[in-house]
From Swiss-Prot:
InterPro entries per record: ATP-grasp, ATP-grasp_carboxylate-amine, ATP_grasp_subdomain_1, PreATP-grasp_dom_sf, PurT, PurT/PurK_preATP-grasp, PurT_C, Rudment_hybrid_motif
UniProt pathway annotation: Purine metabolism; IMP biosynthesis via de novo pathway; N(2)-formyl-N(1)-(5-phospho-D-ribosyl)glycinamide from N(1)-(5-phospho-D-ribosyl)glycinamide (formate route): step 1/1
Oligomeric form and interacting partners: Homodimer.
Domain annotation ATP-grasp: ranges: 109-300
Keywords, sorted A to Z: ATP-binding, Ligase, Magnesium, Metal-binding, Nucleotide-binding, Purine biosynthesis
Organism: Leptospira borgpetersenii serovar Hardjo-bovis (strain JB197)
PROSITE patterns in the cross-refs: ATP_GRASP
This protein's name: Formate-dependent phosphoribosylglycinamide formyltransferase
Cysteine disulfide links: none
Amino acid sequence: MKKKILLLGSGELGKEFIIAAQRLGQYVIAVDFYDGAPAMQVAHEKEIINMLDGNLLDQVVKKHKPDLIVPEIEAIRTERFYEYEKQGYQIVPSAKAANFTMNRKSIRDLAAKDLKLLTAKYLYASSEKELAKATKILGFPCVVKPLMSSSGKGQSIIKSPKDISKAWEASQTKGRTSATEIIVEEFISFKSEITLLTVTQKNGKTLFCPPIGHRQERGDYQESWQPAEISEVQLKEAQRMAEAVTKELTGFGIWGVEFFLTEDQVYFSELSPRPHDTGMVTLSGTQNFNEFELHIRAILGIPIPEVTQERKGASAVILASTDGKIPEVRGLDIASEMPESDFRIFGKPITRPYRRMGIALSYSTKGEGISSLRKRAILLASKIKVD
């Protein structure tokens, strides 16, 4: 069952996915806009193109004729996926899923209006004037997001009328496309946020991984831990929502479904139809299969009977602090002295401030608490420098 996989996007998540795929004997071509991307370092072949150029994307698909097309990022001309499906290519998880989830308007309307899932109240705005009007309706604080962006790019919190102009400017210059429309959300005063990794299978039931807690800064993940603290009632509701939305989007693979938790409510936030950055905590052995192993098994149609929690774990990001090329890694000897810990250096060839260059991992088989594991992962990350 050797398949040819075209991986669109070659970051750290793609690198771990390729490693998992190769362990099952698969052949992978890694694609990205720059040479030397992490996943290219472990792929059988590579292609360097602008994936937002549909014609270039067509050429790569025609050249390689893959059995599976697996998106790893959102900055892709995903509209082409519908045509690829008509031509007989398998899109992971599906063309519909890839297109809906890259656009916050599509996925939010699907969740809130079609599936009636609980979400933050929201409005759309296509001008600074409309944004100001939306803030009057939703109140302060509120959250502004481009319809298409990732890792917090272009997002901001409006706390008062004086923030409106700056928030509008950020949404227009830091998003992923030239589209002017944005989404404006009420600010949910949540006690925590979780990622529920959800696995849809071709010939098996939908599975849920133990919930993952995470902390964000600048709109990007800084640390995650598993399992997250959540009541049984809220967990069941999150699982119900995750199953509903993934079933509607169709397809097989792993999904990172994000929720806000208040004292008594579960709010659907958004989802990614692929391995999730917060899910890298599973590399610390928290589950019988990590998220990348689950993804490749699901898309190949290999049955996954169950997902079991094996131990507790935590992750913390290792960030660059300067601009540079061919970075030097320091501190691995010191970091390696910590017990029940591990790390991954992604191999990115270029640094810039706050760019994620690796992760630190901690785990426990002796009943150690999550708080202690988080502290150890953060301490470990601080010992490693990639600049």
